[in-house]
Amino acid sequence: PICGDFNMFGGLYRGVELLVTEDVCIEPAYYASSGVFFTQSDVSEKKAHLKIEALLSARETTVTGCEVEFQLYDKEKLLCRVASAEVGEDKKVMMDIVLERPHLWDGVKNPYLYKGVVILRKDGKEIDRREEEIGFRYFHADAEKGFFLNGKPYRLNGVNRHQDRAERASAFYPQDHDEDLDLMQEMGCNAVRLCHYPQAKYMHQQMDKRGLVAWVEIPFVNVYVNNPAYDENLRLQLKELILQNYNHPCILFWGLFNEINSGWLDRPSRMAAELHALARQLDPSRPTMGASNQDDDFNGFTDLIAFNKYFGWYGDNMDDMGRWIDREHAAHPERKMGISEYGAGACVFQQEDSLRHPEPWGQWHPENWQTYYHVENWKQLQEREFLWCNFIWCMFDFSAAGRREGSIMGRNDKGLVTYDRKIKKDAFYFYKANWNQEDKFVYIAGKRLVNRTRKTVDVQVFSNSGAAKLYINGKAYGTAKPDSVNVLEWKGIVLDTGENRIEVRNKYGADCCVWICPF
């Protein structure tokens, strides 16, 4: 990108490999792809059609005597094999199989994977191979009913993720990616938007295994410059994104743009339409999508559209989110619509009793406003079943050198987890209560506000395990039941002077903290 509200780091920060090949090999240099492409079609519980395409490379030799074989494995069991006739001079091999009764890749519930192996032989001797995992699935979005995976409703509840963290910037170790994914799955995500640029292939591989749906995208961010070199760069990045990641079952969408704005430089509509056509040509099996914050014609160019909206943070009122969604849906009922970004800043070291809308560009971002923001926004989003997705902005705090806000300069603090991944903010547990129904828990919000300035308080708790009882210094304050978004509240509780041990319990667990009241 030529601009963006995030840091763009340079340098080599992924693995480096030395490729040593025979004179004939499976093509390693076709847009840095694997040279092997698996295309699924007509997938159902009854059968799945798979087209296999392999590209070969030959240096100063012919491909005479070369043969390509495809093998499909279920775990370690060989299910089928198919061999090509001798490879032609176009150095391209096409094969087809039909798999009866495939075990489907079914998201986080059952991310079942097969293994596809492509073997190149010359004069009967194996000289190259590729092994890639295959997950058979079918999916679609409906403008009125939302998203479906394998024929069943599957609302995509997810987060945005920048590949950026304390001490590493973008230079992640594999365990850093794993930690991010562990935190997302603890919260209950079933999808991740890998914003706003191609991220590590290791991330895609792990999302295949974990069943997390991936939205991947090119860095066409904010502005467009009507320039042949700019256009060609966009085309090249889209080709690389699609061809390098073509076989990953977790990737269901190709993202073409984020917050492109006709009012800043040149109009981006022509380029958005061209990128859509290119993506459909390269991969007709996946829809295109864009993330927009504009009311413009390009919102209708992609197969799916989602919007970045921050009602209740950058001005406006919290309730405007639902009203705006309904107006947009009524104006364009044919569009398959989702929410790609919504969020509010929070610093875990800034706490207050009062609930006041902070200045987003100011230095005071109390945690309780972020919590309130997400509770109120999720109430509105969950009610609108026609939305095919909702992605929180964002999972982790990240670096943005141009920002002068919150407690740390150069930091976007809208994450649900801190930049170093050490502290989960209250809003993290709110979403865990709504999205994760397996890991039963109760959690007291506001526990970091230890020194209280009010004697009378409301106690707020998040629970995915039903009702809970409140105790303060051992005294019972009754039972509260969760509301429609799994929030429990005890209103008007009078604290004791001095130390107050707050404890919440139910049959699945407990949580406690200490609040100090000087009055």
Region locations from a protein language model:
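Secreted/periplasmic carbohydrate-active enzymes, especially glycoside hydrolases
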Residues: 1-196, 200, 204-214, 237, ...
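Substrate-binding/catalytic cleft of secreted carbohydrate-active enzymes
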Residues: 169, 178-184, 191-434, 438-458, ...
